[in-house]
Design a protein with these regions (language model features):
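Selected alpha-helical membrane-embedding segments in polytopic membrane proteins
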Residues: 2-96
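Select subsegments of transmembrane alpha-helices in polytopic membrane proteins
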Residues: 3-12, 107-108, 134-140
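Alpha-helical transmembrane segments of multipass membrane proteins
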Residues: 13, 46, 50, 79-80, ...
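Non-cytosolic membrane-interface motifs at loop->transmembrane helix junctions
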Residues: 30-38, 93-106, 158-169
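Generic serine detector
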Residues: 38, 42, 57, 62, ...
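C-terminal ends of transmembrane helices
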Residues: 50-61, 118-127, 177
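Membrane-proximal helix-loop-helix units in multi-pass membrane proteins
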Residues: 79-132
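Terminal transmembrane helical module of multi-pass membrane proteins
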Residues: 120-178
């Protein structure tokens, strides 16, 4: 099931790249402080959360699998936090959220919604076993991989804006699942 999920993620990412345009490789976000940590952390968090969700959703499997993506998720958010601190320092202590970019919100929505729907389809029967961990891990997987995919088509934003969008949505969805 994890391989099926990865195939669906690649298909969605390719479709979004075709529709929105490729930025080139590697993403310029890697040049910003914390950019590599954030990108690789999001990819690893997404993949590990996918594997974990398919483990915790099987009756008799340990709930400890739910902790598998946590180090990668911490690296992802730490990378964004590092970018925020570097940006505040570069701006002389000013905190600029840069809310003018609705293109960023559109890109996040166009990438994450199909990924989340596919993941929820893959675990639709598993919700009976452990509904909260299954939902939280499914959302973390979709959020992590969509964050990485968005960076392929959308330029660097304010690190604080990125943290607010991705971090806020992950926290909101996890709270809603609880």
């Amino acid at each position: 099931r994890t391989l099926a999920w990865c195939g669906a993620v690649v298909a969605v990412a390719l479709l979004v790249v075709v529709l929105m345009g490729w930025r080139g490789a590697p993403p310029e976000d890697f040049a910003h402080p914390g950019g590599r940590w954030s990108w690789w952390g999001s990819v690893l968090a997404g993949l590990l959360a996918a594997y974990a969700v398919f483990q915790v959703s099987v009756p008799g499997r340990s709930l400890a699998w739910a902790w598998l993506p946590m180090p990668a998720a911490i690296a992802w958010f730490a990378g964004m936090g590092w970018g925020c601190l570097a940006q505040v320092r570069a701006d002389g202590g000013a905190v600029a959220l840069g809310l003018g970019s609705w293109h960023c919100a559109l890109a996040i929505t166009l990438v994450s919604a199909p990924m989340l729907l596919v993941m929820l389809l893959l675990v639709r029967h598993a919700g009976v076993v452990r509904p909260v961990p299954t939902t939280v891990l499914a959302m973390l997987s979709a959020a992590g991989l969509s964050s990485a995919a968005v960076s392929l088509v959308h330029g660097h934003e304010s690190a604080l804006l990125t943290l607010a969008w991705h971090g806020g949505v992950v926290l909101l969805l996890c709270a809603a699942a609880w």
